Curated annotation (Swiss-Prot):
It is found in: Cytoplasm. This is Translation initiation factor IF-2. Pfam families: EF-G_D2, GTP_EFTU, IF-2, IF2_N. GO terms for molecular function: GTP binding; GTPase activity; translation initiation factor activity. Residues 85-108 have a biased composition (Low complexity). Residues 508-515 are annotated as: G1. The keyword Protein biosynthesis applies. GTP binds at residues 508-515, 554-558, 608-611. Residues 136-170, 180-194, 204-217, 229-252, 305-322, 345-357 have a biased composition (Pro residues). Gene3D superfamilies: 1.10.10.2480, P-loop containing nucleotide triphosphate hydrolases, Translation factors, Translation initiation factor IF- 2, domain 3. Residues 554-557 are annotated as: G3. The lineage of its organism: Bacteria, Pseudomonadati, Acidobacteriota, Terriglobia, Bryobacterales. Residues 608-611 are annotated as: G4. It comes from Solibacter usitatus (strain Ellin6076). InterPro entries: EF-G-like_DII, IF2_II, IF2_N, P-loop_NTPase, Small_GTP-bd, T_Tr_GTP-bd_dom, TF_IF2_bacterial-like, TIF_IF2.
């Protein structure tokens, strides 16, 4: 079957290709087509007729030439034969075109009336088409033509309903040999009514119609086709005749079987003309169908031509000399009737106006004959067409061009309508879940900011806040431990809460007896083991009193351990403020009060050392009341208990008050939940590795639990209590030493047992990355302002120091203490601080930076000591913080430039001058003030003007050399490198001494 591309057909019809694609489903083409796809010739014929173009006669019947008759065609012919009238004499009639069947729902189309029978005309010889001609359209709403009896020929291709046509008179050459025409279908409309329009459902093919056959007089030399059986016809009286068709060019067709003629038709076969294939064999008709189709029908009333409707193009008329054959469909804005002076089918002349629209420009698609008017908007098309359609896109682009340009104003973020809680290291997926949006929307917001992330990638807290703001949500940033604790607390049951032991922190000034008081309670001797008799570590202990446990935390009282005291106040339930009765309130006592008030915990004052003779407890109460702590016996709410750590006086009363205050607070915990606590202290043990002292505040800590502690992830390998006994479980308010950390945590970090190890490792990596970035930011390139500042501070000396301590808290305290010693003359710079013994890497670092190494309660390793001796590195070891700070101060003083001071000795007056050979000028002088030492320096004053400064060459009394001449004595003085001495000059003796620089004035 011949095919044609949609692009070529669109250019031929002068329409857009997408309009043809939208029309294909209505013609029964359900396949997916594109602009470059091909369609069958029969579909192309329907499209040509739909758009009002003449169908060339050289387009042959594809079903009759290239393909055998299909089963569907056979059924259609059987259906047509079932509606044919009874057999009648065949007669040659004028050629006609197929008619569009009336809708099945139209009642007028179903009424059938018998038509008068006419004698059949003899069959004319069949000729091939010789010339193209316009299709001749039947009246609107006409019924299908009846079919004669006999064998069926190849079916004609289905065509859509053509446009109406003006009837013409029959040609005078009708008597010449011509092609037999099909019988005229009987009119099937009620009288004085407009014929109903044929309505086709979208996506269904138009009803088939027969192909028109031209009946024109053959020209000389024209080759005619073979004989063809005529069809019985019952023309309606007064029906308009069809015009003659233009001869078509010859075309090779496949031989067809000849239909047997009906009654009255000539039975003798016609002789085939030259070039015509042999006729098909004749098949006798079925008697039952002949009898059925030969039944008489009711006559049909003559039909008047329908008046043209607005918006519907009228049927194409015959060509007129001097006018174009194709006049095209009526376009938008074109009048239905041509104006005077305007040629039909041509655009009107517009002098000075714009050019007419291009023929292929987008126009309105006109419906076919009998079809309802199309909707206002182009809603046609196959189901599943992509939207928006091309027309909508073009219309939108035109509107953008035509309407005035407006300044683009970016819409601000939506108003805040909710608040979410985000933790550090939140991922894109977790943020989308909290915002209740899809993750791809969050990723799109990040891509708009130029940030490309994966769905499981962590986000910075500031960036997550900005993204949440774009979705109309405010954020509250909390740590991972706090968020995990909140989720656990929300899920826990109040019935699981049990009473826990109180945590008591002992605070006070140094040497006020804090550790001694705790030793008396624990019946131990911890203070005796402390270096210098002072506490330099924070410790936690558990004491049992009357079947109940009390946890004590001992904090240092030295001024350098402020952060330790602050850390102890944050994890405590009760603060015991120890004040010596013989010393009174001291600066660290006031600091401890401030820490306790900041932590909002109750305070119990223990007035210690009441066994001494000079103890004044009442004076202590007065001083504390001036600071806002009013005793109970004075009408206040602060419990004050006089105690003595040495004689254990008042200790039972102190413990009783601790339990009473704890009962008032109603301290409870849930032992069945995952454990959480606080790191009190951390140290690096040589045999056990990193060890952390943890106070469990809630839950139960067991061996084998995974935990996160700041930027450290680990697993509990072993636990030891305060007495060094290994345990398997630690209940709430229990201090334990935990082994199994990957690295050393910071003192004060939160300790949290986790179940999601992957999430915990992700948080640890995030924190570690942040710490590295912070360290890198400190060592980044300096700015120009910083360079100028360093140039201005070029006179400031710097003392680099490396600190190694036994525990992390001590290293932290030492770093802060030494940095506070810096002033405008000498600056102490701590290059590195760590925990553990002094190793070889510390020595090499000190050698490279010309620093000194300070070890606090640690010793250097063997290879480190050898390296330090080889590299000449100064290593200082200390156990008491007092001695350490004093030595650093001396080192700072030694860095400054020496200061020399002039010390006056005495002066002598020149009374006479002598000149001796081999010696030079000698001045005879008398000492008038002080003394003149021989090794001192001197200056010569003449009229109170210094004329020379130098050293004394020789000092003699008479003929003897002397070391010193005192006041009132005479002597002879010679000066080195100076001989211009005169009578009356003053020789002043002085000495230069080096004076130590005062660093701390």
């Amino acid at each position: 079957m011949k095919k044609i591309r949609i692009n070529e057909l669109a250019r031929e019809l002068e329409v857009k290709a997408h309009e043809i694609l939208e029309r294909l489903p209505e013609l029964g083409v359900t396949e997916k087509k594109t602009h470059s796809s091909s369609i069958d010739e029969d579909v192309a014929i329907k499209l040509r007729q739909y758009y009002g173009q003449d169908v060339p006669d050289y387009v042959h019947d594809p079903n009759a030439v290239d393909e055998p008759a299909t089963e569907a065609h056979e059924e259609r012919h059987e259906h047509e034969e079932a509606h044919e009238p009874a057999a009648a004499p065949k007669a040659a009639v004028e050629p006609e075109t197929p008619v569009a069947p009336a809708p099945e729902a139209a009642p007028a189309a179903k009424e059938e009336r018998p038509a008068p029978e006419e004698p059949a005309r003899p069959m004319a010889p069949i000729r091939p088409p010789l010339a193209s001609g316009r299709p001749i359209h039947p009246p609107v709403g006409a019924t299908p033509p009846p079919r004669p009896e006999g064998p069926r020929a190849a079916p004609a291709p289905p065509l859509p309903p053509p446009a109406p046509q003006v009837p013409h008179a029959p040609s005078p050459a009708a008597s010449s040999p011509a092609m037999p025409a099909r019988p005229e279908p009987p009119a099937h409309h009620p009288p004085s009514q407009t014929p109903p329009a044929a309505v086709f459902a979208p996506g269904r093919p138009a009803p088939p119609s027969a192909k028109p056959l031209p009946t024109t007089t053959p020209r000389p030399g024209q080759v005619l086709s073979g004989p063809r059986q005529p069809f019985p016809s019952s023309p309606a009286p007064g029906a308009p005749q069809r015009p003659q068709a233009i001869p078509r060019p010859p075309q090779q067709v496949r031989p067809e079987s000849q239909r047997p003629s009906g009654p009255g038709a000539p039975s003798a076969p016609q002789r085939p003309l030259a070039g015509q294939p042999a006729a098909r064999p004749v098949v006798p008709p079925r008697p039952d169908l002949v009898a059925k189709l030969s039944a008489p029908r009711a006559p049909v009333m003559p039909q008047q031509p329908a008046a043209p409707r607005p918006g519907v193009p009228k049927a194409p008329s015959a060509p007129v000399p001097g006018q174009p054959i194709y006049r095209g469909p009526i376009r938008p804005g074109q009048p239905m009737v041509a104006k005077p002076g305007v040629r039909p089918g041509m655009p009107p002349s517009r002098p000075g106006g714009p050019r007419p629209q291009h023929p292929t420009s987008r126009g309105r698609i006109e419906p076919g004959m009998g079809a309802p008017p199309p909707p206002a908007e182009p809603s046609r098309g196959r189901p599943g067409d992509r939207r928006p359609v091309r027309q909508q896109r073009e219309r939108t682009e035109e509107e953008k061009i035509l309407r005035p340009q407006r300044r683009h104003v970016e819409a601000g973020p939506p108003p805040i309508s909710r608040e979410i809680t985000i933790s550090e290291g939140i991922t894109v997926k977790e943020l989308s879940e909290k915002l209740d949006v899809k993750a791809n929307l969050v990723m799109k917001k990040l891509m708009d900011r130029g940030i490309f992330v994966a769905i499981n990638q962590t986000l910075d807290g500031k960036l997550a806040t900005e993204v949440a703001r774009d979705f109309g949500a405010s954020t509250a940033t909390v740590s991972y431990e706090v968020e995990a604790m909140q989720s656990v607390e929300e899920a826990q049951d109040t019935t699981d809460l049990e009473r826990r032991a109180p945590v008591v922190t002992i605070m006070g000034h140094v040497d006020h007896g804090k550790t001694s008081l705790l030793d008396a309670i624990r019946e131990a001797n911890v203070a005796g083991r402390e270096a210098g008799g002072i506490t330099q570590h924070i410790g936690a202990y558990q004491v049992e009193m009357k079947g109940r446990k009390i946890v004590f935390i001992d904090t240092p009282g030295h001024e350098a351990f402020t952060r330790m005291r602050s850390r102890g106040a944050k994890v405590t339930d009760i603060v015991i403020l120890v004040v010596a009765a013989d010393d009174g309130v001291m600066p660290q006592t006031l600091e401890a009060i401030d820490h306790a008030k900041a932590a909002a915990v109750p305070i119990i004052v223990a007035i210690n050392k009441i066994d001494k003779a000079d103890a004044q407890p009442e004076r202590i109460k007065q001083q504390l009341s001036d600071r806002g702590l009013l005793p109970e016996d004075w009408g206040g709410d602060v419990v004050m208990v006089p105690v003595s750590a040495r004689t254990q006086q008042g200790l039972p009363d102190l413990l009783e008050m601790i339990l009473l205050v704890a009962d008032m607070q109603d301290l409870k915990a849930n032992p069945s939940r995952p454990a959480m606590g606080t790191v009190i202290e951390a140290q690096l043990d040589r045999g056990r590795g990193p060890v952390a002292t943890v106070l469990v505040r809630n839950g139960t800590l067991s061996v084998g639990d995974f935990f996160i502690c700041g930027a450290v992830f680990g697993k509990v390998r072993a636990m030891l209590n305060d007495r060094g006994t290994q345990i398997r479980k630690a209940e709430p308010s229990t201090p334990v030493e935990v082994l199994g950390l990957d690295s050393l945590p910071e003192a004060g970090d939160d300790f949290q047992v986790v179940t999601d190890t992957a999430k915990a490792k992700q948080i640890v990596n995030f924190r570690d990355q942040r710490q590295k970035e912070a360290a890198l930011a400190k060592s980044s390139r300096i700015t120009l302002e910083q360079l100028h500042q360093q140039m201005r501070e070029g006179e400031v000396k710097e003392l680099p120091v490396i600190i190694k301590a036994d525990v992390g808290g001590s290293a932290e305290v030492l770093k802060e203490t030494l940095e506070k010693l810096s002033n405008d003359k000498v600056k102490v710079r701590v290059i590195h601080s760590g925990v553990g013994a002094i190793n070889e890497s510390d020595i090499l670092l000190a050698s490279a930076s010309n620093a000194i190494v300070i070890g606090f309660n640690v010793r250097p390793e063997r290879n480190a000591a050898a390296t330090a001796e080889q590299e000449k590195v100064d290593v200082r070891l200390h156990t008491i913080i007092y001695n350490l700070t004093d030595e650093i101060k001396r080192a700072m003083s030694g860095l400054l430039a020496p200061v020399f001071k002039e010390v006056y000795r005495g002066k002598a007056e020149v009374r006479e001058t002598f000149r001796i050979s081999k010696v030079g000028a000698v001045a005879g002088c008398q000492v008038i003030d002080g003394s003149i030492p021989r090794d001192s320096e001197c200056r010569v004053l003449r009229d109170n003007i210094v004329v020379h400064t130098g050293k004394i060459g020789s000092l003699r009394r008479f003929k003897d050399d002397v070391s010193e001449v005192k006041i009132g004595m005479e002597c002879g003085i010679t000066l080195a490198n100076f001989a211009d001495l005169k009578q009356g000059d003053i020789i002043e003796a002085f000495a230069t001494e080096r004076v130590a620089t005062e660093v701390f004035a």
